[in-house]
Protein backbone atom coordinates (compact mmCIF):
# COMPACT_ATOMS: atom_id res chain seq x y z
CA UNK A 1 0.00 0.00 0.00
CA UNK A 2 1.26 3.47 -0.88
CA UNK A 3 1.83 6.73 0.96
CA UNK A 4 2.50 9.76 -1.24
CA UNK A 5 4.27 12.93 -0.07
CA UNK A 6 3.64 16.00 -2.22
CA UNK A 7 4.70 19.63 -2.12
CA UNK A 8 1.68 21.92 -1.91
CA UNK A 9 3.32 25.28 -2.71
CA UNK A 10 6.32 26.16 -4.94
CA UNK A 11 8.75 23.60 -3.54
CA UNK A 12 11.23 23.62 -0.66
CA UNK A 13 8.45 22.83 1.81
CA UNK A 14 10.47 20.21 3.67
CA UNK A 15 9.24 17.01 2.00
CA UNK A 16 12.55 15.24 2.61
CA UNK A 17 12.26 15.36 6.39
CA UNK A 18 8.86 13.69 6.40
CA UNK A 19 10.12 11.13 3.89
CA UNK A 20 13.00 10.35 6.23
CA UNK A 21 10.65 9.93 9.20
CA UNK A 22 8.26 7.62 7.35
CA UNK A 23 10.91 5.71 5.41
CA UNK A 24 11.82 3.15 8.12
CA UNK A 25 8.36 1.60 7.69
CA UNK A 26 8.68 1.44 3.89
CA UNK A 27 9.97 -1.43 1.79
CA UNK A 28 10.24 0.68 -1.36
CA UNK A 29 10.87 4.42 -1.70
CA UNK A 30 10.23 5.87 -5.15
CA UNK A 31 10.40 9.04 -7.22
CA UNK A 32 8.02 9.49 -10.13
CA UNK A 33 9.01 12.59 -12.12
CA UNK A 34 11.33 15.58 -12.38
CA UNK A 35 15.09 15.36 -12.51
CA UNK A 36 18.20 16.49 -10.69
CA UNK A 37 16.73 20.00 -10.48
CA UNK A 38 14.95 18.95 -7.29
CA UNK A 39 16.91 19.15 -4.07
CA UNK A 40 16.56 18.57 -0.36
CA UNK A 41 18.71 17.71 2.62
CA UNK A 42 18.19 15.07 5.28
CA UNK A 43 20.01 14.90 8.60
CA UNK A 44 20.36 11.33 9.90
CA UNK A 45 22.59 10.24 12.77
CA UNK A 46 24.18 13.68 12.78
CA UNK A 47 25.14 13.53 9.09
CA UNK A 48 23.58 15.78 6.43
CA UNK A 49 22.82 14.15 3.08
CA UNK A 50 21.85 16.09 -0.05
CA UNK A 51 19.48 14.48 -2.55
CA UNK A 52 18.72 15.68 -6.06
CA UNK A 53 18.02 12.78 -8.41
CA UNK A 54 18.06 9.87 -5.97
CA UNK A 55 15.19 8.92 -3.64
CA UNK A 56 16.03 9.77 -0.03
CA UNK A 57 15.01 6.27 1.04
CA UNK A 58 18.65 5.35 0.47
CA UNK A 59 19.25 6.58 4.03
CA UNK A 60 17.26 3.55 5.24
CA UNK A 61 19.47 0.43 4.84
CA UNK A 62 16.42 -1.84 4.59
CA UNK A 63 14.65 0.04 1.81
CA UNK A 64 14.78 -0.49 -1.96
CA UNK A 65 14.61 2.67 -4.09
CA UNK A 66 13.18 3.28 -7.53
CA UNK A 67 13.51 6.12 -10.03
CA UNK A 68 10.24 6.08 -11.99
CA UNK A 69 9.48 6.32 -15.68
CA UNK A 70 8.60 10.03 -15.84
CA UNK A 71 11.95 11.14 -14.40
CA UNK A 72 14.42 12.74 -16.81
CA UNK A 73 17.61 10.97 -15.87
CA UNK A 74 21.04 12.66 -15.87
CA UNK A 75 23.46 9.73 -15.82
CA UNK A 76 26.58 11.56 -14.51
CA UNK A 77 24.58 13.00 -11.60
CA UNK A 78 23.26 9.56 -10.73
CA UNK A 79 26.74 8.11 -10.23
CA UNK A 80 28.11 11.27 -8.62
CA UNK A 81 25.30 11.36 -6.07
CA UNK A 82 25.75 7.68 -5.21
CA UNK A 83 29.47 8.27 -4.64
CA UNK A 84 28.81 11.22 -2.33
CA UNK A 85 26.41 9.15 -0.24
CA UNK A 86 29.05 6.43 0.07
CA UNK A 87 31.66 8.99 1.12
CA UNK A 88 29.33 10.05 3.94
CA UNK A 89 29.08 6.50 5.23
CA UNK A 90 25.97 5.07 3.59
CA UNK A 91 26.64 1.46 2.66
CA UNK A 92 25.22 -0.85 0.03
CA UNK A 93 23.60 2.05 -1.87
CA UNK A 94 24.44 0.51 -5.25
CA UNK A 95 22.38 -2.57 -4.40
CA UNK A 96 19.34 -0.57 -3.24
CA UNK A 97 18.60 1.63 -6.25
CA UNK A 98 16.83 0.81 -9.52
CA UNK A 99 16.03 2.97 -12.56
CA UNK A 100 13.10 2.54 -14.93
CA UNK A 101 14.16 1.60 -18.44
CA UNK A 102 11.45 4.00 -19.69
CA UNK A 103 13.10 7.13 -18.23
CA UNK A 104 14.22 9.72 -20.76
CA UNK A 105 17.88 10.70 -20.64
CA UNK A 106 18.79 14.26 -19.66
CA UNK A 107 21.99 14.91 -21.63
CA UNK A 108 24.58 17.64 -21.10
CA UNK A 109 23.25 18.85 -24.46
CA UNK A 110 19.95 19.66 -22.77
CA UNK A 111 21.68 21.74 -20.09
CA UNK A 112 23.53 23.74 -22.76
CA UNK A 113 20.23 24.38 -24.55
CA UNK A 114 18.53 25.31 -21.27
CA UNK A 115 20.95 28.20 -20.78
CA UNK A 116 20.53 29.44 -24.34
CA UNK A 117 16.74 29.35 -24.11
CA UNK A 118 16.85 31.43 -20.93
CA UNK A 119 19.01 34.00 -22.75
CA UNK A 120 16.50 34.02 -25.63
CA UNK A 121 13.67 34.84 -23.22
CA UNK A 122 15.52 37.85 -21.78
CA UNK A 123 13.38 39.65 -19.21
CA UNK A 124 10.75 36.91 -19.52
CA UNK A 125 13.13 34.13 -18.49
CA UNK A 126 11.67 31.39 -16.31
CA UNK A 127 14.52 31.21 -13.80
CA UNK A 128 15.26 27.53 -14.39
CA UNK A 129 17.98 25.61 -12.56
CA UNK A 130 19.87 25.38 -15.86
CA UNK A 131 20.07 21.59 -15.62
CA UNK A 132 18.33 20.75 -18.86
CA UNK A 133 15.01 19.64 -17.42
CA UNK A 134 12.77 21.68 -19.75
CA UNK A 135 14.64 20.74 -22.94
CA UNK A 136 14.65 17.07 -21.85
CA UNK A 137 10.88 17.06 -21.49
CA UNK A 138 10.58 18.98 -24.77
CA UNK A 139 12.43 16.27 -26.69
CA UNK A 140 10.37 13.64 -24.88
CA UNK A 141 7.11 15.24 -25.99
CA UNK A 142 8.46 15.78 -29.51
CA UNK A 143 9.20 12.03 -29.57
CA UNK A 144 12.85 12.65 -30.38
CA UNK A 145 14.27 11.87 -26.93
CA UNK A 146 16.43 8.93 -25.88
CA UNK A 147 15.12 6.50 -23.28
CA UNK A 148 17.27 4.49 -20.89
CA UNK A 149 16.72 1.19 -22.70
CA UNK A 150 18.02 2.77 -25.91
CA UNK A 151 21.40 3.43 -24.30
CA UNK A 152 22.03 -0.32 -24.59
CA UNK A 153 21.52 -0.31 -28.37
CA UNK A 154 24.66 1.51 -29.47
CA UNK A 155 23.55 2.14 -33.06
CA UNK A 156 20.16 3.61 -32.10
CA UNK A 157 21.64 5.60 -29.23
CA UNK A 158 24.35 7.29 -31.31
CA UNK A 159 22.02 8.01 -34.22
CA UNK A 160 19.36 9.63 -32.03
CA UNK A 161 21.82 11.70 -29.99
CA UNK A 162 23.50 13.00 -33.17
CA UNK A 163 20.09 13.90 -34.59
CA UNK A 164 19.25 15.81 -31.41
CA UNK A 165 22.55 17.67 -31.49
CA UNK A 166 22.22 18.52 -35.18
CA UNK A 167 18.74 19.91 -34.65
CA UNK A 168 19.89 22.20 -31.86
CA UNK A 169 22.99 23.20 -33.84
CA UNK A 170 20.75 24.40 -36.67
CA UNK A 171 18.78 26.49 -34.20
CA UNK A 172 21.61 28.01 -32.16
CA UNK A 173 24.64 27.79 -34.46
CA UNK A 174 27.98 28.60 -32.86
CA UNK A 175 26.27 29.74 -29.67
CA UNK A 176 25.84 26.06 -28.77
CA UNK A 177 29.06 24.91 -27.09
CA UNK A 178 28.66 21.16 -27.18
CA UNK A 179 30.62 18.21 -28.57
CA UNK A 180 28.29 15.30 -29.34
CA UNK A 181 31.17 12.90 -29.96
CA UNK A 182 32.53 13.56 -26.47
CA UNK A 183 29.17 12.71 -24.94
CA UNK A 184 28.88 9.55 -27.05
CA UNK A 185 32.34 8.49 -25.86
CA UNK A 186 31.35 9.02 -22.21
CA UNK A 187 28.29 6.83 -22.68
CA UNK A 188 30.41 3.89 -23.79
CA UNK A 189 31.47 3.66 -20.14
CA UNK A 190 28.05 4.55 -18.74
CA UNK A 191 26.44 1.83 -20.86
CA UNK A 192 28.29 -0.84 -18.89
CA UNK A 193 27.92 0.84 -15.50
CA UNK A 194 24.20 1.54 -15.83
CA UNK A 195 23.06 -1.93 -16.86
CA UNK A 196 22.78 -3.46 -13.33
CA UNK A 197 20.47 -0.65 -12.17
CA UNK A 198 18.00 -0.78 -15.05
CA UNK A 199 14.63 -2.44 -14.53
CA UNK A 200 11.19 -2.75 -16.09
CA UNK A 201 9.52 -0.51 -13.51
CA UNK A 202 5.99 -1.43 -14.58
CA UNK A 203 6.53 -5.08 -13.68
CA UNK A 204 8.50 -4.15 -10.59
CA UNK A 205 5.72 -1.96 -9.20
CA UNK A 206 3.00 -4.42 -10.18
CA UNK A 207 4.71 -7.20 -8.23
CA UNK A 208 5.36 -4.92 -5.25
CA UNK A 209 1.71 -3.87 -5.06
CA UNK A 210 0.44 -7.43 -5.53
CA UNK A 211 2.62 -8.51 -2.60
CA UNK A 212 1.29 -5.73 -0.39
CA UNK A 213 4.62 -3.96 0.01
CA UNK A 214 4.63 -0.64 1.84
CA UNK A 215 5.61 1.94 -0.77
CA UNK A 216 6.63 5.50 0.06
CA UNK A 217 6.55 7.94 -2.85
CA UNK A 218 8.26 11.32 -2.64
CA UNK A 219 7.08 13.99 -5.02
CA UNK A 220 9.60 16.37 -6.55
CA UNK A 221 9.06 20.15 -6.82
CA UNK A 222 5.45 21.03 -5.92
CA UNK A 223 1.94 21.54 -7.22
CA UNK A 224 2.34 25.24 -8.04
CA UNK A 225 5.22 24.30 -10.36
CA UNK A 226 3.12 21.69 -12.20
CA UNK A 227 3.18 22.05 -15.99
CA UNK A 228 -0.65 22.04 -16.12
CA UNK A 229 -1.76 23.46 -12.78
CA UNK A 230 1.10 25.73 -11.77
CA UNK A 231 1.71 29.40 -12.61
CA UNK A 232 2.42 28.65 -16.27
CA UNK A 233 4.86 29.41 -17.90
CA UNK A 234 6.78 29.91 -14.63
CA UNK A 235 6.71 26.20 -13.88
CA UNK A 236 8.77 23.06 -14.27
CA UNK A 237 8.16 20.76 -17.23
CA UNK A 238 6.56 17.77 -15.53
CA UNK A 239 3.39 16.90 -13.64
CA UNK A 240 4.33 17.41 -10.01
CA UNK A 241 0.99 16.50 -8.45
CA UNK A 242 -0.92 13.31 -7.79
CA UNK A 243 -1.54 12.66 -11.49
CA UNK A 244 2.19 12.67 -12.20
CA UNK A 245 2.79 10.14 -9.44
CA UNK A 246 0.24 7.71 -10.84
CA UNK A 247 1.62 8.07 -14.38
CA UNK A 248 5.29 8.07 -13.46
CA UNK A 249 5.13 4.94 -11.32
CA UNK A 250 2.16 3.07 -12.84
CA UNK A 251 0.76 2.99 -9.32
CA UNK A 252 -2.70 1.50 -8.74
CA UNK A 253 -4.89 4.43 -7.54
CA UNK A 254 -7.00 2.07 -5.43
CA UNK A 255 -3.92 1.09 -3.42
CA UNK A 256 -3.05 4.62 -2.27
CA UNK A 257 -3.57 4.95 1.49
CA UNK A 258 -2.26 8.42 2.28
CA UNK A 259 -1.69 11.58 0.25
CA UNK A 260 0.22 13.95 2.49
CA UNK A 261 0.58 17.56 1.42
CA UNK A 262 3.62 19.33 2.82
CA UNK A 263 3.10 23.05 3.44
CA UNK A 264 5.54 25.53 4.89
CA UNK A 265 4.14 27.78 7.64
CA UNK A 266 4.93 30.71 5.36
CA UNK A 267 5.62 30.74 1.60
CA UNK A 268 8.79 30.73 -0.50
CA UNK A 269 9.53 30.63 -4.19
CA UNK A 270 12.72 30.34 -6.27
CA UNK A 271 13.02 32.05 -9.66
CA UNK A 272 10.52 34.17 -11.55
CA UNK A 273 6.75 34.04 -11.56
CA UNK A 274 3.76 35.27 -9.57
CA UNK A 275 3.89 35.25 -5.78
CA UNK A 276 0.96 37.20 -4.38
CA UNK A 277 2.01 37.10 -0.72
CA UNK A 278 5.68 37.91 -1.29
CA UNK A 279 6.97 40.43 1.25
CA UNK A 280 9.77 42.64 -0.04
CA UNK A 281 10.08 44.54 3.23
CA UNK A 282 11.33 43.63 6.71
CA UNK A 283 9.12 40.56 7.20
CA UNK A 284 10.32 38.89 3.99
CA UNK A 285 13.97 39.50 4.84
CA UNK A 286 13.42 38.20 8.36
CA UNK A 287 11.79 35.01 7.06
CA UNK A 288 14.67 34.51 4.64
CA UNK A 289 17.34 34.97 7.30
CA UNK A 290 15.77 32.95 10.11
CA UNK A 291 14.52 30.25 7.74
CA UNK A 292 17.88 29.97 5.93
CA UNK A 293 16.03 30.23 2.67
CA UNK A 294 18.44 29.38 -0.11
CA UNK A 295 18.30 26.42 -2.45
CA UNK A 296 20.03 23.04 -2.10
CA UNK A 297 20.23 22.64 -5.89
CA UNK A 298 21.19 26.18 -6.93
CA UNK A 299 22.24 28.13 -3.84
CA UNK A 300 19.86 30.89 -4.94
CA UNK A 301 18.06 32.89 -2.27
CA UNK A 302 14.37 32.14 -2.06
CA UNK A 303 11.72 34.83 -2.25
CA UNK A 304 9.72 34.86 1.00
CA UNK A 305 6.27 35.90 2.12
CA UNK A 306 3.19 34.97 4.09
CA UNK A 307 1.21 31.74 3.93
CA UNK A 308 -1.31 31.82 1.08
CA UNK A 309 -4.36 29.73 1.90
CA UNK A 310 -5.90 30.42 -1.51
CA UNK A 311 -2.94 28.54 -2.98
CA UNK A 312 -3.19 25.76 -0.40
CA UNK A 313 -6.92 25.29 -1.00
CA UNK A 314 -6.32 25.18 -4.77
CA UNK A 315 -3.51 22.67 -4.29
CA UNK A 316 -5.76 20.55 -2.08
CA UNK A 317 -8.52 20.53 -4.70
CA UNK A 318 -6.11 19.02 -7.24
CA UNK A 319 -4.10 16.63 -5.07
CA UNK A 320 -6.88 15.56 -2.67
CA UNK A 321 -4.66 15.51 0.40
CA UNK A 322 -5.75 13.18 3.18
CA UNK A 323 -3.39 14.89 5.65
CA UNK A 324 -1.04 17.86 5.87
CA UNK A 325 2.46 18.32 7.25
CA UNK A 326 2.95 21.93 8.40
CA UNK A 327 6.70 22.64 8.40
CA UNK A 328 9.03 25.28 9.83
CA UNK A 329 6.46 26.62 12.28
CA UNK A 330 9.38 27.64 14.52
CA UNK A 331 10.51 30.24 11.97
CA UNK A 332 7.51 32.32 13.06
CA UNK A 333 8.52 32.25 16.75
CA UNK A 334 9.54 35.92 16.95
CA UNK A 335 6.75 37.56 14.93
CA UNK A 336 4.34 39.75 16.92
CA UNK A 337 1.58 39.12 14.39
CA UNK A 338 1.36 36.70 11.49
CA UNK A 339 -0.49 37.41 8.27
CA UNK A 340 -2.33 34.74 6.29
CA UNK A 341 -3.91 35.23 2.86
CA UNK A 342 -7.54 34.08 2.93
CA UNK A 343 -8.80 35.49 -0.40
CA UNK A 344 -7.95 37.75 -3.31
CA UNK A 345 -9.97 40.88 -4.14
CA UNK A 346 -10.84 42.67 -7.36
CA UNK A 347 -9.81 46.29 -6.62
CA UNK A 348 -12.31 47.60 -9.18
CA UNK A 349 -15.40 45.94 -7.73
CA UNK A 350 -14.28 45.00 -4.23
CA UNK A 351 -15.46 41.44 -4.94
CA UNK A 352 -13.52 38.73 -3.15
CA UNK A 353 -12.10 35.87 -5.21
CA UNK A 354 -11.53 32.61 -3.37
CA UNK A 355 -10.06 30.66 -6.28
CA UNK A 356 -6.64 30.73 -7.98
CA UNK A 357 -7.02 31.99 -11.59
CA UNK A 358 -5.21 30.45 -14.57
CA UNK A 359 -4.74 33.86 -16.24
CA UNK A 360 -1.64 35.51 -14.78
CA UNK A 361 -2.87 38.91 -15.92
CA UNK A 362 -6.01 38.50 -13.83
CA UNK A 363 -3.95 37.15 -10.94
CA UNK A 364 -1.66 40.18 -11.09
CA UNK A 365 -4.62 42.57 -10.96
CA UNK A 366 -6.00 41.10 -7.74
CA UNK A 367 -5.22 42.33 -4.24
CA UNK A 368 -4.59 40.00 -1.32
CA UNK A 369 -7.04 39.82 1.58
CA UNK A 370 -5.13 39.01 4.78
CA UNK A 371 -6.19 37.86 8.19
CA UNK A 372 -3.80 38.73 11.03
CA UNK A 373 -3.24 36.23 13.79
CA UNK A 374 -1.31 36.83 17.02
CA UNK A 375 2.21 35.45 17.29
CA UNK A 376 3.47 33.43 20.25
CA UNK A 377 6.85 35.11 20.86
CA UNK A 378 8.56 32.09 22.38
CA UNK A 379 10.65 29.20 21.00
CA UNK A 380 8.75 26.03 20.17
CA UNK A 381 11.55 23.67 19.09
CA UNK A 382 11.52 21.86 22.44
CA UNK A 383 7.77 21.22 22.27
CA UNK A 384 7.20 17.48 21.94
CA UNK A 385 3.41 17.27 21.92
CA UNK A 386 0.70 19.39 20.37
CA UNK A 387 -0.41 20.79 23.71
CA UNK A 388 3.16 21.81 24.54
CA UNK A 389 2.77 24.46 21.84
CA UNK A 390 1.66 27.95 22.91
CA UNK A 391 -2.07 28.49 22.45
CA UNK A 392 -1.37 31.06 19.70
CA UNK A 393 0.64 28.49 17.74
CA UNK A 394 -2.18 25.98 18.14
CA UNK A 395 -4.66 28.61 16.98
CA UNK A 396 -2.53 29.17 13.87
CA UNK A 397 -2.48 25.43 13.12
CA UNK A 398 -6.21 25.07 13.67
CA UNK A 399 -7.05 28.10 11.54
CA UNK A 400 -5.18 26.57 8.59
CA UNK A 401 -6.75 23.18 9.17
CA UNK A 402 -10.29 24.52 9.34
CA UNK A 403 -9.83 26.78 6.31
CA UNK A 404 -8.53 23.99 4.08
CA UNK A 405 -10.58 21.15 5.56
CA UNK A 406 -7.69 18.68 5.87
CA UNK A 407 -6.17 17.47 9.17
CA UNK A 408 -2.67 18.68 10.01
CA UNK A 409 -1.06 15.48 11.27
CA UNK A 410 2.60 16.53 11.37
CA UNK A 411 4.04 19.82 12.63
CA UNK A 412 7.69 20.70 12.07
CA UNK A 413 9.17 22.66 14.98
CA UNK A 414 12.88 22.71 14.13
CA UNK A 415 15.58 21.52 11.72
CA UNK A 416 16.32 18.14 13.28
CA UNK A 417 14.62 14.87 12.43
CA UNK A 418 13.10 14.63 15.91
CA UNK A 419 11.65 18.15 15.71
CA UNK A 420 8.30 16.90 14.46
CA UNK A 421 5.06 16.73 16.43
CA UNK A 422 2.72 13.93 15.40
CA UNK A 423 -0.93 14.88 15.79
CA UNK A 424 -4.19 13.21 14.78
CA UNK A 425 -2.27 10.03 14.00
CA UNK A 426 -5.54 8.20 13.44
CA UNK A 427 -5.90 10.08 10.14
CA UNK A 428 -2.81 8.28 8.79
CA UNK A 429 -3.27 4.72 7.57
CA UNK A 430 -0.39 2.44 8.53
Curated annotation (Swiss-Prot):
Positions annotated to bind GTP: 11-17, 39-41, 302, 328-330, 412-414
EC number(s) on file: 6.3.4.4
UniProt-listed Pfam families: Adenylsucc_synt
GO biological process: 'de novo' AMP biosynthetic process; cellular response to cadmium ion; IMP metabolic process
Reactions catalysed according to its record: IMP + L-aspartate + GTP = N(6)-(1,2-dicarboxyethyl)-AMP + GDP + phosphate + 2 H(+)
Subcellular location: Cytoplasm
Residues noted as binding IMP in the record, renumbered to the chain: 12-15, 37-40, 129, 143, 221, 236, 300
Residue ranges of coiled coil: none
GO CC terms: cytoplasm
Catalytic residue list: 12, 40
PROSITE patterns xref list: ADENYLOSUCCIN_SYN_1 (PS01266), ADENYLOSUCCIN_SYN_2 (PS00513)
Binding of substrate, residues: 296-302
Main location: cytoplasm
Pathway: Purine metabolism; AMP biosynthesis via de novo pathway; AMP from IMP: step 1/2
Keyword Oxidoreductase tagged: no
Molecular functions per Gene Ontology: adenylosuccinate synthase activity; AMP binding; GMP binding; GTP binding; magnesium ion binding
Purpose: Plays an important role in the de novo pathway and in the salvage pathway of purine nucleotide biosynthesis. Catalyzes the first committed step in the biosynthesis of AMP from IMP.
Protein name: Adenylosuccinate synthetase
Amino acid sequence: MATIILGSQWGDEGKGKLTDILCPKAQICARAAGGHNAGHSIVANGVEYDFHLLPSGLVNPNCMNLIGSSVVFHVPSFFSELSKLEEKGLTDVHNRILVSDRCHVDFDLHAAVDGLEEVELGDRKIGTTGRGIGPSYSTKMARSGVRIHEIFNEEIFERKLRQLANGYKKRFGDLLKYDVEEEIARFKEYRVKLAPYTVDAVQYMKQAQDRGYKILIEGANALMLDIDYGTYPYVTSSNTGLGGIITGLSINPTKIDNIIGVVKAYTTRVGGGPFKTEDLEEAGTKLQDIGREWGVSTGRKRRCGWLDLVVLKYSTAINNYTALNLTKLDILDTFETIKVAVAYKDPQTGEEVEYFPADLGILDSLEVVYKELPGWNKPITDCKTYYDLPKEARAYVEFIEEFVGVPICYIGTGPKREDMIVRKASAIKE
